Each structure stands twice: as C-alpha cells, then as structure tokens.
Regions:
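A compositional/biophysical signature of low hydrophobicity enriched in polar/charged and small residues
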Residues: 1-96
Length: 96
C-alpha cells in the first residue's frame, strides 16, 4: 500500500458550493473506501491549498480516484507519493 498526500484547491465551481464541501468529502471517502483506499486524514487549510488529504492504497486505485475527483469539477489536485520511515530506511539502505 502506498501513502498519498493530496493537495487540493477549490475551482470556481467548488468555491461557489463551498458549504457542501463536508458532504462532498464524505462522498469522496465512501468512493475511496469502495476502491480499497483508506482516507487517513483530511484538513481544510489556509495558505496555498484549500485542503490536504492523506490516503493509503494501491497506486492504480489512487490514480483512478484522483481522476474521478478531478472530473467532478470542484477541486484541482496535486498528489504526492509519501514514504514512511521504514520505506525510507529500505531505500537509503540500497545506497552502497
């Protein structure tokens, strides 16, 4: 399973319907769970991004979910692949 950090900004459409954002998140979470992805956390934020989500699941399922989220037109996203300490140790252990 891979960790993904999703940085999201509302589109104009999403901003106009911002009051529905918590319900849209619940729908996203249900869709994610149906695809085998766990939503570890969500935060509505100030600054450069409107939301930050952390998910965990298979790479292909995560990408498909991101495309589905984008196709709804409420947010634009940037997704980062995250590595935990054990994964990082394995990778740097190969630097011989």
């Amino acid at each position: 399973m891979s960790a993904h950090i999703i940085l999201a900004n509302f589109t104009d459409q999403g901003a106009r319907a911002i009051k529905d954002s918590p319900e849209r998140f619940e729908a996203f979470k249900a869709l994610a769970e149906g695809a085998g992805i766990t939503v570890k956390s969500v935060h509505w934020t100030t600054g450069a991004y409107d939301m930050v989500l952390v998910t965990e699941g298979p790479e292909e399922a995560a990408m498909t979910l991101n495309m589905k989220m984008a196709s709804l037109g409420n947010v634009r996203t940037q997704t980062l692949r995250g590595y935990d300490a054990a994964e990082m140790r394995r990778m740097v252990g190969k630097l011989k």
